[in-house]
Structures are given as structure tokens and as C-alpha cells.
Amino acid sequence: MRSKARARKLAKSDGDVVNNMYEPDPDLLAGQSAEEETEDGILSPIPMGPPSPFPTSEDFTPKEGSPYEAPVYIPEDIPIPPDFELRESSIPGAGLGIWAKRKMEIGERFGPYVVTPRAALKEADFGWEMLTDTEVSSQESCIKKQISEDLGSEKFCVDANQAGSGSWLKYIRVACSCDDQNLAMCQINEQIYYKVIKDIEPGEELLVHVKEGAYSLGVMAPSLDEDPTFRCDECDELFQCRLDLRRHKKYACSSAGAQLYEGLGEELKPEGLGVGSDGQAHECKDCERMFPNKYSLEQHMIVHTEEREYKCDQCPKAFNWKSNLIRHQMSHDSGKRFECENCVKVFTDPSNLQRHIRSQHVGARAHACPDCGKTFATSSGLKQHKHIHSTVKPFICEVCHKSYTQFSNLCRHKRMHADCRTQIKCKDCGQMFSTTSSLNKHRRFCEGKNHYTPGSIFTPGLPLTPSPMMDKTKPSPTLNHGGLGFSEYFPSRPHPGSLPFSAAPPAFPALTPGFPGIFPPSLYPRPPLLPPTPLLKSPLNHAQDAKLPSPLGNPALPLVSAVSNSSQGATAATGSEEKFDGRLEDAYAEKVKNRSPDMSDGSDFEDINTTTGTDLDTTTGTGSDLDSDLDSDRDKGKDKGKPVESKPEFGGASVPPGAMNSVAEVPAFYSQHSFFPPPEEQLLTASGAAGDSIKAIASIAEKYFGPGFMSMQEKKLGSLPYHSVFPFQFLPNFPHSLYPFTDRALAHNLLVKAEPKSPRDALKVGGPSAECPFDLTTKPKEAKPALLAPKVPLIPSSGEEQPLDLSIGSRARASQNGGGREPRKNHVYGERKPGVSEGLPKVCPAQLPQQPSLHYAKPSPFFMDPIYRVEKRKVADPVGVLKEKYLRPSPLLFHPQMSAIETMTEKLESFAAMKADSGSSLQPLPHHPFNFRSPPPTLSDPILRKGKERYTCRYCGKIFPRSANLTRHLRTHTGEQPYRCKYCDRSFSISSNLQRHVRNIHNKEKPFKCHLCNRCFGQQTNLDRHLKKHEHEGAPVSQHSGVLTNHLGTSASSPTSESDNHALLDEKEDSYFSEIRNFIANSEMNQASTRMDKRPEIQDLDSNPPCPGSASAKPEDVEEEEEEELEEEDDDSLAGKSQEDTVSPTPEPQGVYEDEEDEEPPSLTMGFDHTRRCVEERGGGLLALEPTPTFGKGLDLRRAAEEAFEVKDVLNSTLDSEVLKQTLYRQAKNQAYAMMLSLSEDTPLHAPSQSSLDAWLNITGPSSESGAFNPINHL
């Protein structure tokens, strides 16, 4: 314990000491000094050198020469209790004193004593000096008094002479002798009081005496919680308890001791007391305390003779605490004392003083951030904070290479790796990792073998499992993830025994690889497993079902065939399919037998235990080296064009040599589309119309999205062997003619990426591809009998208008799905004109060349992209705005937890109609695939919630990475606002908001200045918003349609030139209707006869109960999105380019361009006249389509029915302008989607024979003869 300080009254002389205890007030205002605290009317004598070494004498400069010459008057500002009066004291030269007006009995207390801490005292009569025990000695003529320990570390004075303080106790004077004393000081509850120790008669002055020789420490109560004191009647000494008083009377009191022991026999006297024969007690020479015998005195002397470790080198004093020694040494050299100007603390080192000022006083947080204005007490804190603005993250995790701005965050992150009990081994370089995410990052830059060749990390690691999509009656022994109905949408595979989750139904482990466009590779590894085809019973999956059951009643087709280097390869493949299927069954049986022991070692992805791929409980990597060797062998075999033997890790894709011309390319489709099994239509006979349509879409996609989406790895090693779009082959209702999973050539060109050709050049490529036996140019009527069967239609349609995604994802989708079934090596989307016919009757998926797939940098799924923007225009839905911000395509699109999928639920539910139709051979799903809110009981909780439940909000279920985030989030539910402004009592839930409030509102700090008009702002965001206004005002009229305003009314800057607009258009790739215009312009119109041929099938689909949608039942958010896209197309067609400025309130053509992902677009201001004019003007240009072959069935994205206005009704309605504008906007977008969709419908595009507006209006409603789309029937 630290030595406790003592209080002493500064003495005027050796005999006259003042006893005036104090209670220091820590709230000393800055700038006050002792010189300011004198009282004009009360004059004190000049101190005659205080005994304390504290240099206060030089500060005592009395205003008058002598206290005897000073006039004595009674201050009016001091309230005196009615029991007392203030008049001249009986002590000579003391000035005023307190006199009693009534009788005061023993034990009464007066107080508390009001004092103020000071560095020095102006008048010694009205203050006390704080000293430590060791600084007080008997010759200093002061009493030792303990005070609060936290004040004992500093030496300072307290002043009771503050004007207006109301402390009348300061006028209690010091008695000349102890006989005149009638008061004693005591400390109760950290307050100083005077206590009556003698009866005081009326007219008697209150006096205190603290002569140390007369009264010891017991006179003053040392305890903060003082009990009633007891006074000795003989010597007037006070004691804290009655026992001490009795002991004192028996042994110590000189008057009572002799009488006590005279009556006691020798045998009754206390043993060892050693009372002298003369009956005299023993006195301590240091503290003058009396003891009854020598033994007690010796025990007491230990206190005085205790060895003290810290001794002063300038005087004999020693101290128990180093701090006391330092404080004492300051008295020897006052020049080295550094006093704080704001408080009474004194420091020996200037650095300590500076640290004290920064941390304790106003302006302490002197280090301000130049970017955001946040202040810090230390420069190191500011330096660490600046990392936030500079994007510098110096603290990097060595396991997963994630970086942080603060070391504490890195430590918190590392605790996540501690949960990983196993290591994941890179199959290329052998490096071990504790998380799949770190392994995934490593793979991007791994210097080992080629990752993207079919024999590398994307080698099939698991046998393919059959999907129950086509045949629900046959149980699948190897199916483990079908319980939720996810097997219909996501790849199913045997569940490795090493994975911790249940082997029964949970399909979520397969969910992540099933959504590569949703979950980027930064969160998940690129799994080497070969998923099955969910739509078809795969012969590779099940030995009992070696033949592919055709849902359309056609003969079973081989699932894998050879990719020939010549056009003869296709004929050989189709000619040997029966023979090949038989061999394939044997190959798969052998593969399953050999592969099963190595089930848990075949691929890195098998180590993933949750959807995050982070918490791993399995062992892995034991077979990695073997797999790598086998991969290398397989690569060699493929390069040489030799057959590859059936190997356990080959994934069941091995094929006998007799089935093809080049067996080396047999497993290409599966190994490279590790996520995507072949679509249904690819396994059937090819449709020339579908191929032509795909080429049309591919041309547009290549033109606008071409090589720009290829990542660095693709540029070095070729395109990724998987798609980064939504796997529509898992969706039974999706027309796979729109989403072909073509294969790439497996020769050397996998490693060489040729320069992409423009879509027009690609369309001009004449001859058939040597590696693409699939006829991309078969005319619709030629392929129709082989493609469709009357029993089961491929694409159910409900007559509603399902919008095609025209956003960045659509272009990405077009480049991948509709990218023409062309050889992958050229990275083009078509090499033949749509009209060229090559007439190959049948096709095998392995023969289908693969179109380029986008890298995960832009993972926009084909049908998910409208979902991303579905609430983009909902200004009134801030929650949706926040969701949209994080649902936009980006490299870090979703958090790996299942909560990310939970946030997608609302959007995905609007596409609920993608379930299998009850009227088709595909049975309806037992559980909605996207109903993540209420998963069936078969879904295990660990998979759903992961491991950080301790940071889960109990109100809304949100999961946070750290407790601080959860604490702050909970305040949104509880309404707690713990941070209160001291100026205006306004409360905040976040401390940074309070600091910003104080800076901007109360301190009027506006550090952000506009360089154009010198206007200042308190926040950077306000300045940015202001600068946007300058840009808008200074931009030409033609560019005023480029300013994008968000939901707060702020605007984002727009380019100042047309070239900049186009540059931003290419960067953001959000010019939807520019794509529509060019799409239609580059498409050719086809004959209308094929439309009526397929109407019976479409009518048959309309009768399906699960598909009750119509064009008027679109979700409002999707309609809004469609309206926005139409408006952009309107403005593009009128203004001639995509622009970024705010939509003007006038009907002047203006485009809405999304400058930033998280910004809200402005409210729509397009009038009906403007819409009609845009539609009519575009009728002759955009709608004058060239003959274009039809696609397969249109996309049937049925959604939950919501009310929507028909365009014709809106034209005649009397709704207010805002509703009219919004409705027109939605309907216009619907029409735009229908225009794209018309190219994929069986309905051909006719030459324009009606007015443009009528043609558009015909799109909205189902035709009278069927409920299918009737898009632009009469254009």
C-alpha cells in the first residue's frame, strides 16, 4: 500500500499552528491559481517560514503589511448558522472567530469543511498542506492525519479561503494551548468535520488545538467511517472505541494508572506489562505516545524503526515508496518541478507532464485525423487509425493471408484458425493450409502444376451420383443430399464418411459449389469433384442405371462421348452410343469399387465441413500426391490423344477407346464443368433453332462482355473450367437451349487463349469446328422432332412475361450460356452463321465445346441478376437498399455463413415457380429449394448456423463476426443510446456519431472546404454531395442526364465527355438497354411458321397448376427493375449514348446510370408521353428486326403473384402521375425483357406490321389460344 498523506495546518510560528483539515476537490477548474483566491477583507500574517519544504512562502504576498492594522469586518457572503456568530477572535491577530450562541455538548459535529485544492496557499490561516507520513516530523509542529489514498501520491495544498465558498468553519481559530481547545478534527466519509470534545457554553469561542506533543493521532479519527469517539475524562484524549478508552484508563492515563494498580494484587496484574515500581508509563520519544510498560513501547517502536528502502541522498529521510522519495526530492530542487497548469499535480519529467495533459485535460485528444477529424490522445493511436483511410492493413494472417488494420483484430481472427484441427494440402505444391479459403487463395497464385487443365485440381474427385430429378421412384444408394429437395437443383454426390455432417439428407454441402455465381472462390475452393447431372439419371452415377433415361421418351443417349478432332468424330460418337453405354456401365462399376476406399482423400473440397469451408474436423490430403500423379498421367494421356484408363479418381468419366476417335477428350465436359452437369437438351438431339438463337445471344454477349471478364488466370492459363453463373441445368424448368454447357477442346489450346473475335467475326466463321460435332446451325424444323416429344414439353410456360436479365450478369450469362456451342480454345462465341446447317442428328455432352466462362470477379448468375437489383429502385425500403448493397455481384458477394443465403431468401422466393411442374414428368419438389427460412428437420443445425452463435442477435438472428458489432447492433432493437452530448443532452448509440455531432454542431468545425466556392462542410460526404452539384451545374445540357442521385438526394459525379460516359459504361456494364438494342439489331428475324407448330405444347404447359403466373402478377420489385431498364433504353435511343446524370423532371430524354452499387437511383420522372414517344420512335429502328431463328422454349421464371397494372389500363386510369409513371416504367421493362425472350421462344419474330405501341401492348397479356408468351407477335 502506498503511504497515506497527512494534512497539516501551515504554521505562523513554532507555537501557533493552524488545524484546519480539508477535503480536496478534484474538479479544480483550469487556470485558477492561488493568487486569485485571496479574500480582500481577511488579512493573514506573513508566514514565518513553513516547516514543510513545499515552496509556498515565496507565493505568500499579503496585500496589507500586518494583520493587526487590517480592518476587521464581517463578510456578508458567508452564511453562519443561527447557533453561532462571527466576530473578532480572542486569539491575538487571528481576525474573525466563531462564537457559540448556545450550549454545545460533547460529540456534536460541525461541517463539512469546504476546501479547494491549490498548488500553493496565499494565506496560511485558511488552508492546509498535504504531506506524507514520512514528511511529517515532530519538530514541524503539525498533527499527522491520514486522508484518501488516491490523494496521497501528490503533495499539494487546499485552500478554504475561496470567495463565496460558504465555509464558515475556516474561521475556527487555533487555541494557544491544549487547555483552551474545545474542538477536534475528524474525517467522516471523506469529509472534514469539527467535533466538540468539551462542553461549550454560550458566548464561548470555538477553538482547536493540534499540538502534537499534547495529542496523538488518536485525537483525529483516521478512519473514513468514524465511529463515535470516546474521550478520556482525565486527559481529554479521544479514542475510537470504548475498549481503547478503558485500556487507556487502566494502563496509560497517568492519573488513573497508579490508583488502578494500587488496588490490584501482584498476582492479578497483567503479566509482562512491566509497569515500573513508580507506576509510571513509558512514553514514545518519537510520537509522545504513552505505554504502560516497556514491552508495549518496544512493540510500538517497530513502527518507527522499520527499515525504509528508498533513502534521500540529500538528507537522512527514507521512504517506503519510491514515489514518496521522488516527491520529497522535488523539495530539494524546486527548479526541476513541472507543475500542471490545469491541476495541482507536479511532475519531475516534462514528458510525464505532457502525457498527463494529453490524457487528463481539455484538449487532451490533440491528435486529429486529417481525413475524418477523429481525435486521439496519442500519436500512435492516430497512426493506427489512419490505416482505415489509407487502406493499409499491416497485420496479415499467415494462415489465410487476410489483413487487418489493428493487431487486436488479427488476434481475434487467428482464434478462428485454432478451431481447425486438420490441414488441407495443396495438390499441386504440397503446401498445407488450415482453411479452404486460404487454400483457395493459394491456388490463384500457386506455382505448381496448371490448375486449369482437366487433369489438375479440377479432376473429378468423387463418383457421380444419380439425381432423383427424373426418376423419383428409383432409390439412389449413393444419393445423400436429396432430402431437402436440393438434389433437384444442386449437384448431389456421395457423402464422404470423413465429413462431420450427417450423411442423410442435408444438401447444403453441395449448395455452395452449386452456386458458383453466388459464392465466389474467395470464399470457397474450386472443388475438383464431378457433380452429377441433376436433371438426368447419370449412367456414371449408378451401375444399375447406366443408360440415360430420356424424359421425353426418346431412346437413351450416351452421357459422354468423344470430342473428335474432325467432323467425323460426331458421327462415330453417335453411331457407337449403344455400345458405349454398355462399356460405360462397366467402367463406372470398376470406378466405384476402386474409388470408395479413397473417398475422403480425393479432393480438397471434401474437407469442407460447413458451407463456410472453414471449420474443418476431418483429415485430408493423404491421397493428394497420388491424385497429383494420376492427374499428371491423365494430362499426358490427353496431350498424346491416347485413351485414359479407368482410374478411381477419374470420377467415372473413363471411356473405352472404341467409343470415340479421341478418347483423351472424353471426361472433358465433366472435369471442366465441375459444378455444372450437361443440360437436358444437350443430352438430347440438338436443335438448330436453339443453336442459331444461342449464337445470336452469344454474339451480343461477346461483343459487350468479351475478354474483359477474363481474369489474370484465364489470360495466363485459359478460361476457368467452370461457369460463374447460376446453374440452370439444376432447374428443370429452365430452357437449356439458353444455357448450353458446351465443352472446350482438351488439346493444347486449353493452355493457350486465342484472341477473341468480335461477334460478327465469330458469326462469319464458316466451316464446322473440328472439335464440335454438335451442329449449331440446324434449322428449327430439322431438329424439332429429335428435340421435343409431345409427352413432356421441355419448357413449361404460363403465359406470363418472364424478364431476361439484361444487366451485367446477362452479358456474363450470354457469354457463358448463350455463348454458342463453339470450341473453347478460340474464346469466341460462335464460328458459323446461324443459317449454315450441318445436320448432325445427335450429340453427346462431352462433345460439346465449352464457351468461355466468366471469372468469379463478376459472378452474376443468369437469373439471379434481376434479384440483385430487384429492390434497387425501392427508395422507401431502406432495408432492401442495405440488402442490395451486399447482394450486388462482387468478389466478396456473400459471407460464407448460411445467414448469407438467408438474406437471399426474399429475392429467391419471388422465383418460386422454378420448381418442377406437376404436369410434367419431373415431379414437384418436396421442399421449396430456396425456402431457407424454414428448413426441414433433416437440415442439421450446425450446417445452418455455423459456429459463431455467440455473436448472433437474439432479436433478428443476424450473425456478427465480433461481440462489439453485436453490441452496437443490439442498440437498434433496444433503443439504447449510451453516449450523451454534454452540451445539448442529445444521445447517440455510437460514440463516433457523438464525436461527429460535437465537432460539427457545437464546435462548428468544418474542415472540408469546397475549392470552387469556398464553402465548408463538417463531413466529407457533404462535401462530395456538394461537389456533385457543381459538376451538374457546369456540365453541358446533353450530359445533365448523367448525375445519379441516391436516396438521400446526393448525387454522384458524372463524366464530362461522351467518351467518359462510354468508358464508365464499359466499366460498370450496367447499360441494359444498350444491350437490348444491339442484341436485336444483330439478330435476324425468322419465319413465323415454327411458332404455330409448337403452340400445342405451350398450351399444354399452361395447364400446370404450379404455374399460375401472368404478366400482371410480377413482383413489384422486378417490375420496377424492368421499368428502369426500359427507361435507360429509351434514353439511349434518344440521346444516342448512355449517360450518368440525374433524370430531369422534364420529358427530355435522360438515362439513369448506376454509378455506384450502393447508391439508390432517383425517383422516376418519366411521363407517359415520354414513354410512348420512346416506344414509337424505337418501333421503326429497334423493333425492325432481322430474321432470327427461334430459340428453344422461353425462360419460365414464374414468381409470386402480385398486383400490377396492365399498360392498357394505365393509359385510361386516373391514377396520380407517380403511380402512372412507376407502372409504365415497370411495364416498359417487361416489354424489354419480352423482346429478349422472344429470341428464345418458339414464336418467331415477324416483320413489323402493326404500330409499335400496339405490338408492345400485345406482349403483356397471354394470347387467346395459349397462356404462353406472345411477345411481339405482330411486329
UniProtKB/Swiss-Prot annotation:
Predominant location category: nucleus
Record's keyword terms, sorted: Activator, Cytoplasm, Differentiation, DNA-binding, Metal-binding, Methyltransferase, Nucleus, Repeat, Repressor, Transcription, Transcription regulation, Transferase, Zinc, Zinc-finger
PROSITE patterns: SET, ZINC_FINGER_C2H2_1, ZINC_FINGER_C2H2_2
Annotated tissue distribution: Enriched in BAT compared to WAT. Detected in heart, lung, kidney and brain. Expressed in nuclei of cardiomyocytes.
GO MF annotations in UniProt: DNA-binding transcription activator activity, RNA polymerase II-specific; histone H3K9 methyltransferase activity; histone H3K9 monomethyltransferase activity; histone H3K9me2 methyltransferase activity; sequence-specific DNA binding; SMAD binding; transcription coactivator activity; zinc ion binding
Sequence segments annotated as region (Mediates interaction with SKI and regulation of TGF-beta signaling): 740-1275
Subunit structure: Interacts with CEBPA, CEBPB and CEBPD; the interaction is direct. Interacts with PPARG and PPARA; controls brown adipocytes. Interacts with CTBP1 and CTBP2; represses the expression of WAT-specific genes. Interacts with PPARGC1A and PPARGC1B; interaction with PPARGC1A or PPARGC1B activates the transcription of BAT-specific gene. Interacts with HDAC1, SKI and SMAD2; the interaction with SKI promotes the recruitment of SMAD3-HDAC1 complex on the promoter of TGF-beta target genes.
Name by which UniProt lists this protein: Histone-lysine N-methyltransferase PRDM16
Species for this entry: Mus musculus
Protein's gene: Prdm16
